[in-house]
Amino acid sequence: MSTEQELQIGKVVKSHGIRGEVVVELSTDDPDIRFAIGEVLNGKQAGKEHSLTIDAARMHQGRLLVKFAEVPDRTAADSLRGTRFFAAPLEDEDDEDGFYDHELEGLRVIHEGEDIGEVTGVMHGPAGEILEVRLTSGKETLIPFVHAIVPEVDLEEGTATITPPEGLLDL
């Protein structure tokens, strides 16, 4: 299965400790399923692919720490930095009202009928998602991904229409 059909479920941010654990930034709502002990993850990093078996996974200070069977120490864990993990969608991830990050990235941002920029990324926070947008002026801005501000996303047209409150684009 190619990554076009797969979803990114996490990314190695850094190593943790001396026993080969890594900190994983999650991009899945199902970490208990995706990062269960014994699961084999498909990782991609700078053109290289890894198959890694989860030995242990635990939450620590709000972050997921994962120990892979193939990673014996900190040096090996350091080499995984930037590795992105992909997996096929779970049945319940076919939410018609939701969007995957890769579907939003690259969308043209429309305000009052004008193309004002492009979605360059999606940030996930405790209060919800935020679109990272590069305006046509070259300036970067953040737009909360809530229906009141982003009332329409048209994947076929490749656009996200926004109705920002006054001043949001001036920040």
Curated annotation (Swiss-Prot):
Single GO BP term: rRNA processing
Protein keywords: Chaperone, Cytoplasm, Ribosome biogenesis, rRNA processing
Occurrences of domain PRC barrel (ranges): 96-168
Pfam families: PRC_RimM (PF24986), RimM (PF01782)
GO function terms (MF aspect): ribosome binding
CC terms in the record's Gene Ontology section: cytoplasm; ribosome
Localization per record: Cytoplasm
Gene3D superfamilies referenced in this protein's UniProt entry, alphabetically: PRC-barrel domain (2.30.30.240), RimM (2.40.30.60)
SUPFAM superfamilies, sorted: PRC-barrel domain (SSF50346), Translation proteins (SSF50447)
Residue ranges crossing the lipid bilayer per the database entry: none
InterPro entries, per the entry: PRC_barrel-like_sf, PRC_RimM, RimM, RimM_N, RimM_N_sf, Transl_B-barrel_sf
Task of the protein: An accessory protein needed during the final step in the assembly of 30S ribosomal subunit, possibly for assembly of the head region. Essential for efficient processing of 16S rRNA. May be needed both before and after RbfA during the maturation of 16S rRNA. It has affinity for free ribosomal 30S subunits but not for 70S ribosomes.
Assembly behavior: Binds ribosomal protein uS19.
Family statement: Belongs to the RimM family.
Written domain comment of the UniProt record: The PRC barrel domain binds ribosomal protein uS19.
Protein name: Ribosome maturation factor RimM
Species assigned in the record: Corynebacterium glutamicum (strain ATCC 13032 / DSM 20300 / JCM 1318 / BCRC 11384 / CCUG 27702 / LMG 3730 / NBRC 12168 / NCIMB 10025 / NRRL B-2784 / 534)
Lineage: Bacteria, Bacillati, Actinomycetota, Actinomycetes, Mycobacteriales
Gene: rimM
